[in-house]
Each structure stands twice: as structure tokens, then as C-alpha cells.
Amino acid sequence: MRSKFKDEHPFEKRRAEAERIRKKYDDRVPVICEKVEKSDIPVIDKKKYLVPADLTVGQFVYVIRKRIKLSSERAIFIFVDDVLPPTAALMSSIYEEHKDEDGFLYVTYSGENTFGDLEQYRLE
């Protein structure tokens, strides 16, 4: 999925901002969070997050769920490079493994597991 944030901000500006953020807040990671285009889940009110390095993916999902005011019975999935990251993984390790060349970690979210293929688990 193409990032709207990337489309709206030139690479050099994004890289400079990520560098500035990392220097000023070395215990946090800069994250861009955007909704998967075709998902019927609510749009988030802000895209940029400064996430504590020791936050888990599960805790980050909770933050996103609260920001979009998603009811508890609705599912939410977050993706990094089109893959569901482990819920217990630290955001700092996800950042180190998947950060973009501009210095931001790009995360998308959806109400559906849009990239998972459940056919592979089908019982014959």
C-alpha cells in the first residue's frame, strides 16, 4: 500500500524530521499510522506518533483502537510491510527491522486481516 504521508511530504523533509525526532527523543520511535484504503474501519485523527521504544505491538494496537473509538466487538489488525507483527514484540525491535529509509516506521491498520490467506489452513 502506498503511503499518503509519503505522497504529501518529500523524502528529504521526512528524513530530516525523523532524524530530528530520533536525536531529541532517543527512547521513542517515529511511527506513521494510516488506514488500509479499502477497510471500513474509522480513519484515525492523526498519522504521526512518537511511540515509547518499550511499548509492545499489542499496546500500540490498544492506542490506535482508542484513537479511532473502535468498539470492543470489532477487530483491528495492524500491518508492517504487509505483515502482522507479533503482539508481544517491542515497537523498538519492529522499528529496527522495518523502518523506512526516511527513518519512519510505516504501519497500516484495518478491520480485516486483508493480507492473511486463510485458504492455506482449510481442512479437506
Curated annotation (Swiss-Prot):
The C-terminal 8 residues are removed to expose Gly-116 at the C-terminus. The C-terminal Gly is then amidated with phosphatidylethanolamine by an activating system similar to that for ubiquitin. The record marks G116, D117 as: Cleavage. GO terms for molecular function: phosphatidylethanolamine binding. Its main location: membrane. It is found in: Cytoplasmic vesicle, Autophagosome membrane; Vacuole membrane. It holds the Pfam family ATG8. The keyword Amino-acid biosynthesis does not apply. Signal peptide: none annotated. One of its GO terms (cellular component) is autophagosome membrane. A lipid is attached at G116 (Phosphatidylethanolamine amidated glycine). Residues 117-124 form a propeptide. Keywords: Autophagy, Cytoplasmic vesicle, Lipoprotein, Membrane, Protein transport, Transport, Ubl conjugation pathway, Vacuole. InterPro entries: Atg8-like (IPR004241), Ubiquitin-like_domsf (IPR029071). One of its GO terms (biological process) is autophagosome maturation. SUPFAM superfamilies: Ubiquitin-like. Belongs to the ATG8 family. Ubiquitin-like modifier involved in autophagosome formation. With ATG4, mediates the delivery of the autophagosomes to the vacuole via the microtubule cytoskeleton. Required for selective autophagic degradation of the nucleus (nucleophagy) as well as for mitophagy which contributes to regulate mitochondrial quantity and quality by eliminating the mitochondria to a basal level to fulfill cellular energy requirements and preventing excess ROS production. Participates also in membrane fusion events that take place in the early secretory pathway. This is Autophagy-related protein 8. It comes from Yarrowia lipolytica (strain CLIB 122 / E 150). The lineage of its organism: Eukaryota, Fungi, Dikarya, Ascomycota, Saccharomycotina.
